[in-house]
Amino acid sequence: MQFNRIMNVKPGSMDKVMQMAQKFPERAKEVLGDDYAGPVKFMVRVHGPLNQVKWQWERESMDADMAAAMKLNNDSGWQALVADLSEHMESSSMGDVTWA
């Protein structure tokens, strides 16, 4: 299954978000260890609405993704990254998409 998280970036914050983006997969590897199913791809939209980014990752099932999300959400380092990123977002998620 493929998971996509699309987010709207505040105008003027794209550079900061692009710098922070690489920290998320690094932290996920630390927290999840052998359960890390990477790679996590980070993309910036170049056609269509401006100031959008997307994270994309794959897991074998929705249950596996939910288990990984619970581990990450219980990690203080992950929560600190989310808090830092949220300062640069207009919306936390404008659309999460799952492809089976």
Give short role names for the model-derived ranges.
Residues 5, 17, 55, 65:
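Hydrophobic pocket/interface hotspot
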Residues 2-8:
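Active-site-flanking beta-strand signature of metal-NTP-handling nucleotidyl enzymes
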Residues 13-39, 73-82:
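Short amphipathic alpha-helical segments
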